[in-house]
């Protein structure tokens, strides 16, 4: 006997129930970025996922990036993007545009998408409620010929040094869903642009989040045969970096996951944001859809 659509939906909901109970009143931080941010249909699916998490008793927090949009705005305004060691140099004029794009444009677009589901999202950045303080990032690069390290001056690129969870705890007790842009003040009064992955990791660590999800353009961590690795311990992740299985741009992503776990996150997942409803598939199904990294 063929299953009707209603029967299938009921069966799927019944299967999801244990996971809804597992994550009830738990904090899940989702770093939203990559291809999904530029696709309207994926954006709507993401917003509905976040709304359903909230309706299921989860405390979701969204942190977002916006590198391509920043680059596009700088180009539109005739400002050349400069890079040092593969990292964007952010001068005073650039950081003002970064804040405008991240906190004033992208942030509000995500808030609007979530609000269209009937939930209440609120747009924030690190400046709000003194939530996050940063300091100038100290990055070095090694010269391939001389093997000598030199310090990069990236301008107003920052690193998180302090997270005050007071505002986020207050919002967790409300009906609000925080959507946070990775811009924060320094004790020196400057405004800093912060890598969205590390910003999300710092937020999740300060909240001892049950899960931190990184939405990317890849399925997760792959083995040498190109197959998805479903779960890794921190020690196993270090070993895969050492033997070259984890390479290229996946190295800093995994290192950020490890840092978040050391900061207090119970588990970090790298998953494909190009898959519709990937957040729900990860949280409310038995095996998930990405790579889970645990202590």
From Swiss-Prot:
One of its GO terms (biological process) is arginine biosynthetic process via ornithine. Its main location: cytoplasm. It comes from Rhizobium johnstonii (strain DSM 114642 / LMG 32736 / 3841) (Rhizobium leguminosarum bv. viciae). Catalyzes the ATP-dependent phosphorylation of N-acetyl-L-glutamate. Pathway: Amino-acid biosynthesis; L-arginine biosynthesis; N(2)-acetyl-L-ornithine from L-glutamate: step 2/4. It is an enzyme of class 2 (transferase). Its EC number is 2.7.2.8. The keyword Nucleotide-binding applies. It holds the Pfam family AA_kinase. It is found in: Cytoplasm. It catalyses: N-acetyl-L-glutamate + ATP = N-acetyl-L-glutamyl 5-phosphate + ADP. Belongs to the acetylglutamate kinase family. ArgB subfamily. Gene3D superfamilies: Acetylglutamate kinase-like. PANTHER family: N-ACETYLGLUTAMATE SYNTHASE, N-ACETYLGLUTAMATE SYNTHASE, MITOCHONDRIAL. The record marks 31, 253 as: Transition state stabilizer. Substrate binds at residues 66-67, 88, 193. One of its GO terms (cellular component) is cytoplasm. The keyword Cytoplasm applies. Keywords: Amino-acid biosynthesis, Arginine biosynthesis, ATP-binding, Cytoplasm, Kinase, Nucleotide-binding, Transferase. NCBIfam families: argB. The gene is argB. This is Acetylglutamate kinase. One of its GO terms (molecular function) is acetylglutamate kinase activity. SUPFAM superfamilies: Carbamate kinase-like.
């Amino acid at each position: 006997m063929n299953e009707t659509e209603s029967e299938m939906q009921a069966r799927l909901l019944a299967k999801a129930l244990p996971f809804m109970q597992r994550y009830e009143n738990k904090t899940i931080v989702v770093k939203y970025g990559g291809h999904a941010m530029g696709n309207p249909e994926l954006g709507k699916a993401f917003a509905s996922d976040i709304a359903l998490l909230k309706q299921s008793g989860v405390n979701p927090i969204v942190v977002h990036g916006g590198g391509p949009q920043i680059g596009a705005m700088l180009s539109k305004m005739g400002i050349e993007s400069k890079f040092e060691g593969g990292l964007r140099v952010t001068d005073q004029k650039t950081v003002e545009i970064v804040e405008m794009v991240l906190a004033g444009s992208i942030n509000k677009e995500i808030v609007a998408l979530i609000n269209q589901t009937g939930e209440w999202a609120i747009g924030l950045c690190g400046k709000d409620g003194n939530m996050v303080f940063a300091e100038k990032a100290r990055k070095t690069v090694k010269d391939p010929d001389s093997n000598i390290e030199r310090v990069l001056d990236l301008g107003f690129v920052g690193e998180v040094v302090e997270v005050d969870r007071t505002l986020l705890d207050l919002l967790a007790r409300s009906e609000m869903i925080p959507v946070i842009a990775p811009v924060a003040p320094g004790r020196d009064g400057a405004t800093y642009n912060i890598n969205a992955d590390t910003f999300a990791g710092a937020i999740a660590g300060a909240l001892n989040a049950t899960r931190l999800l990184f939405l990317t353009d890849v399925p997760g961590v792959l083995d040498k045969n190109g197959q998805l690795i479903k779960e890794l311990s921190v020690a196993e992740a270090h070993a895969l970096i050492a033997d070259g299985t984890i390479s290229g741009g996946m190295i800093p992503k995994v290192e950020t996951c490890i840092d978040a776990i050391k900061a207090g996150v119970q588990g970090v997942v790298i998953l494909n944001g190009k898959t519709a409803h990937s957040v729900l598939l990860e949280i409310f199904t038995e095996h998930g859809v990405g790579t889970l990294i645990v202590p």
